[in-house]
Amino acid sequence: MTTEDDKGGRTATVSRWLPFSCVDGPGNRLVLFLQGCNFRCPGCHNPHTIGLCDHCGDCVPGCPSGALALIDGRVRWQASLCTHCDRCLDACPRSASPKTHQMSVAEVLVLLRRYGPLLTGITVSGGEATTQLPFVVALFAAIKAAPDLAHLTCLLDSNGSLGETGWQRLLPVLDGAMIDLKGWRESVHHSLTGQGRERVLASLQLLARAGKLAELRLLQVPGRSDFLDAGGGLDAGLTDFLQTLGPVPIRLNGFRHHGVRGEAMGWQEAAMEELDRLSNALKVKGFGPVSLPPL
């Protein structure tokens, strides 16, 4: 959750952060992973970022290193004792983590200044970053207002569920958004995310009109995705929709078992041949550039 700290600065619940990444947008980027997500994707590869800790304490007894304790009704994590065995993540009934922490806008700016000479920009991801929208807006605004940081691009990695009012708050300080589309037909999208597709499609069109759709990401799940028709060509409805976006980079992601739980462990992993077919179908219709993952 996003809160105001006692100095009036925005804070957010953060799962973790990376000082350098070359896979979360162009260039070398600092990545902030915010906790909490409003989708329930069976194939999520970071399921421990979905929920928020309610301090039930279920994770405490199973910690082999004694890094967790229930003190005054709150779970406390001692990083110096933690071996990162992740048993606490498996024990959590809320798909949360006891290892999250609060970070303020000011603290993120300190990190950006520390690593700034080596950075192209910052990407805020999740979970779902827009569930903590006030923090993201405040952070990006602070970066744009700081002369020594203004050269850094501010990108968002999102599921596209934010409504138009929220996007209008964010657009003035946003350089671009990378949006996931995990299914085309309503029924398929719902089965893969737990939510409908309407807001995602609206977000894609809004960002495209604003010139801030940095990347469209399509997830290919064998036997479940519906981007291709029965003949192996691009679905006609998807073709019509993509034409409304104009030129946009497309990244294909193939489903993998890494990190997933439950029923999705029984799903087939995507082979490169399947991604090649989708890539070729997109290119035949003139969409792209299309990039493939290093499976």
What do the predicted segments below correspond to?
Residues 106-266:
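Conserved AdoMet/S-adenosylmethionine-binding subsite of the radical SAM
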Residues 2-26, 220-295:
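Auxiliary Fe-S-binding modules of radical SAM enzymes
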Residues 64, 93, 113, 205, ...:
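Class I S-adenosyl-L-methionine
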Residues 101, 193-196, 271:
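Short, conserved glycine- and acidic-residue-centered signature motifs
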